[in-house]
From Swiss-Prot:
Transmembrane segments: none annotated. PANTHER family: TRANSCRIPTIONAL REGULATOR, MARR FAMILY, TRANSCRIPTIONAL REGULATORY PROTEIN. One of its GO terms (cellular component) is protein-DNA complex. Keywords: DNA-binding, Transcription, Transcription regulation. It comes from Methanocaldococcus jannaschii (strain ATCC 43067 / DSM 2661 / JAL-1 / JCM 10045 / NBRC 100440) (Methanococcus jannaschii). The keyword Nucleotidyltransferase does not apply. This is Uncharacterized HTH-type transcriptional regulator MJ0925.
């Protein structure tokens, strides 16, 4: 499966950001996404987490998920692409992501 395909799926990038923030159990990720308005079903979240593990972007240790080095680098690239997009046009970046980037990039 292509990494672009996985990253383009609903909720995937938001899941990576939540794990980066230390929200790392299945339930806490689900609750955090729901609170941010990016709710995904329990089934979809399980699928995304499995896909992210398959792509080696995250790893599971017991009941906790953590970013791998590859996952950290992927988020850096995603942030740079969003900054670039915002620079060249009025981007429609999800609010959850804008909050994670901070005002300095807008």
């Amino acid at each position: 499966m292509s990494i672009f395909y996985v990253l383009g799926k609903k909720g995937t990038i938001e899941i990576l950001y939540k794990i980066k923030e230390g929200v790392n159990s299945f339930t806490s990720i689900k609750n955090a996404l729901d609170m941010e308005g990016c709710g995904v079903s329990t089934r979809t979240l399980a699928e995304r987490l499995n896909e992210l593990e398959d792509e080696n972007l995250i790893q599971k240790d017991g009941s906790k998920y953590y970013l791998t080095k590859k996952g950290q680098e992927a988020l850096e690239i995603i942030e740079n692409v969003m900054k670039w997009e915002a620079k060249w046009k009025e981007a429609k970046i999800p609010k959850i992501i804008i909050g994670m980037l901070g005002d300095k990039e807008r």
